[in-house]
A protein has these predicted regions:
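Bacterial Sec signal peptide processing site at the extreme N-terminus
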Residues: 17-43
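Terminal, low-structured helical/coil segments at or just beyond the last alpha-helical repeat
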Residues: 27-28, 32-36, 195-261
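Alpha-helical segment of the N-proximal tetratricopeptide repeat
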Residues: 49-89, 93-100
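Structural signature of tandem alpha-helical TPR/SEL1-like repeats
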Residues: 68-75, 100-112, 134-146, 168-177, ...
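Structural marker of alpha-solenoid helical repeat scaffolds
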Residues: 83, 116-117, 150, 183-184, ...
């Protein structure tokens, strides 16, 4: 819904552009594929020296993170900021690395620091991923909705929002963002995994199996999707009961007001 709330974990690491700027970096998301999409850490750290321009250095740090070298990337972020100063891009990369090294509180602080910058969408996205990782899918939905409002065509954000809504039990609310994500980025394995999860939640098991066959999902990914489908089904039952109770309460108040008259 890898959404990182998105490297979300199927979540799933998305190839990032090396150019610096407001749209240079994106959090990876979560969902049925997040773990499967993480690149394995390199056997040996890269030996190339630090680039001599800010853009090249940020590109190197980003590449290290995509290779799973999160601790090393934190050291290089420190070096970058010592040489060039703190920037929104370096803060975003720090937030990502902190999240991927199980430093959730520090990661959240870094993501929040982005909210008043051109990378506010990435900040909300990251906060949503952290909330989802902590099991707070209602909070994840709120943060991801803000992210999607700021970046309405970002497929990863929409996919993570749809996944978070599924985990919150709001199957109907998950449909539109997931369909948007599927059309915006039809080749994304993470998006397709979350669409399969939606189909299962809608009771369309045959279509879900067909899509998994077409996309050649591995047995491990299919098992992850099935596990998530069970959680979504349980959440959907609770969501239905909760919304039904809310409607009953409204009707009761309306009836009471009518009787008073």
């Amino acid at each position: 819904m890898k959404t990182r709330m998105g490297r979300v974990r199927p979540s799933v690491a998305v190839a990032l552009a090396f150019a610096c700027g407001a749209c240079a970096f994106k959090p990876s998301g979560y969902g049925a594929l997040a773990q499967a999409e993480r690149a394995a850490a390199q056997a040996a750290a890269e030996k190339e020296s630090a680039p001599d321009t800010p853009g090249m250095y940020l590109a190197l740090i980003d590449r290290m993170q995509r290779q799973g070298l999160y601790y090393a990337s934190l050291a290089h972020i420190d070096a970058y900021e010592k040489q060039y100063g703190v920037t929104p891009d370096s803060t975003f990369l720090r937030a990502q690395a902190l999240r991927d090294t199980a430093q959730a509180r520090a990661s959240a602080e870094a993501y929040r620091a982005l909210l008043a910058t051109p990378l506010a969408a990435q900040g909300y996205h990251g906060l949503g991923l952290l909330a989802g990782a902590a099991g707070d899918f209602r909070g994840a939905c709120r943060a991801l909705e803000r992210a999607a409002a700021l970046a309405p065509t970002d497929a990863a954000t929409l996919s993570d929002l749809g996944y978070a809504r599924l985990r919150e039990g709001d199957v109907a609310g998950a449909r539109v963002p997931l369909m948007q994500a599927a059309e915006l980025d039809p080749k994304s394995a993470r998006v397709q995994a979350n669409v399969v999860l939606l189909l299962l939640a809608q009771g369309r098991a045959k279509q879900a199996r067909t899509l998994m066959d077409e996309r050649q999902f591995t047995p491990a990914v299919r098992a992850a999707v099935r596990d998530d489908a069970g959680r979504v089904a349980q959440a959907a039952r609770a969501f239905k009961i909760g919304t039904g109770s809310a409607h009953d309460g409204f009707d009761a108040r309306t009836s009471s007001e009518g009787n008073d008259q």
